[in-house]
Every structure is written in C-alpha cells, then in structure tokens.
Curated annotation (Swiss-Prot):
Gene3D superfamilies: Lipoprotein localisation LolA/LolB/LppX. This is Outer-membrane lipoprotein carrier protein. PANTHER family: OUTER-MEMBRANE LIPOPROTEIN CARRIER PROTEIN. Participates in the translocation of lipoproteins from the inner membrane to the outer membrane. Only forms a complex with a lipoprotein if the residue after the N-terminal Cys is not an aspartate (The Asp acts as a targeting signal to indicate that the lipoprotein should stay in the inner membrane). InterPro entries: LolA/LolB/LppX, OM_lipoprot_carrier_LolA-like, OM_lipoprot_carrier_LolA_Pbac. One of its GO terms (biological process) is lipoprotein localization to outer membrane. It is found in: Periplasm. Keywords: Chaperone, Periplasm, Protein transport, Signal, Transport. Its main location: periplasm. GO terms for cellular component: outer membrane-bounded periplasmic space. Belongs to the LolA family. SUPFAM superfamilies: Prokaryotic lipoproteins and lipoprotein localization factors. Residues 1-22 form the signal peptide.
Length: 208
C-alpha cells in the first residue's frame, strides 16, 4: 500500500542530456492524452531483491483526469484507495479503519501521480526516460521510498506498470480488460464511508 502511494513507479545512461529527458517527458504526456480515463483489471506480483515472489494480488484500477483515482484490491485481502480530486481515502476492511489524506500531499509523493496530473509543477518533480514502449519515471526527491516506476504502453494503451522501491522489491501490475470510464463508473471516485470504522483524518494533522 505504501509503495503504491509513494509509487500506488528511475537511472538512465549518462549520455542522455536534459533535453532528451524533456523530450521523453513530453512524449509520455502526449501518450497520456489517450488515457484521460481508464478502468481496468489488474494482477499484481511482488518480488524481492532475490527475485522471489513474496506477494500476489488482483483487483480493479480506475483513473480519470483531473486527479481522480480508484484502487480496489480484491484478493488476497481487500483494500481500497479512492481519490476524488480533493481528498484521498484508504480503507482497510479487515482493520475496520479509514485513513483520510489531503490528495495533493498524498499523491504528489508518487510517480503514479503523473497518470492523473497534467500540471507542469507536478511533472517537474520527476525525470522521465523512454525505453522502447515503456517510460522510466524517477522522483527527484531522494527520500520518496521509490526508485523507479516504469509505465508501458501498446498502441497508446497502458498495459502494465512496475514499481521498484528502495529495498529492491519490484511490484509488477499487469492490466487487462481496459476500457473508458462510463457515466456509471464515475461513482467509483466517490468514497462512501462505511459504518462502524475507525477514522484517522490526516488532513487535520496537516493543518495543525
């Protein structure tokens, strides 16, 4: 969960110039125009530094511009992350807990933010390098917890992304059944607070 947020995913050859990075970032931005909204199934595989599988999972991912995000892990243990553009909600049914965070504070720590952000300020926080059909995204902040996020496309459609964290773990997310968000799907970005759950409102801590 932490890796997804810091990731919900950065070296390049020294011969590449700053201008090349800028061009690669612009190419990625142009490609993401075709991903203004997306709903897809995903399968997650996490391997450690020794390439041993330490976790698997599956669920549903949805993205919409501007700044809307839905993540529902359905197996093996259920969890949800929902961003409505202002607030971000993290729901753990097993712990019966909901954490609420300011969207900008939470999502800006993640290279995945680039999938739903279009503003120059957010993009300036990352370096982008194109490698065939994939783009490696590196946060410029050294304490992000994420080393690289690689997002891959086929025929301009997002097909997978990988997250490499600072412990050497790689989280691979393979996407399938991609489709454009429908009017009915927009309800996914509105979190409905369950009854009888503990609430940890991080927004209040940010303000104080």
């Amino acid at each position: 969960m932490k890796n997804l947020l810091c990731a919900v995913m950065l070296t390049s050859p020294l011969l590449y110039s700053t201008a090349v990075f800028a061009d690669d970032a612009q190419q990625l931005r142009n490609t993401l125009v075709n991903t203004a909204s997306l709903k897809t199934d995903f399968k997650q595989t996490v391997t450690d530094v020794n390439k041993k599988v330490i976790q698997t999972g599956s669920g549903i991912l949805a993205l919409a511009h501007p700044n809307q995000f839905y993540w529902h892990l359905t197996s093996p243990d259920e969890s949800q992350i929902v961003a409505d553009g202002k607030d971000l909600w993290i729901y753990n049914p097993f712990a019966e807990e909901v954490v609420i965070m300011d969207f900008a504070e939470a999502i800006n720590a993640s290279p995945i933010a680039l999938l739903v952000h279009r503003d120059d300020t957010t993009w300036s926080q990352y370096s982008v390098t194109k490698k065939q059909d994939c783009y490696d995204i590196r946060p410029k902040a050294i304490d992000s917890g994420i080393v690289t996020v690689s997002v891959c496309f086929k025929n301009s459609q997002l097909t997978k992304f990988n997250v490499l964290d600072d412990k050497g773990n790689i989280s691979q997310f393979d996407l399938s059944n991609q489709k454009v968000i429908t009017t009915e799907d927009k309800a996914l970005f509105k979190f409905v607070l369950p009854e009888n759950v503990d609430i940890d409102d991080q927004r209040l801590k940010t303000l104080n």
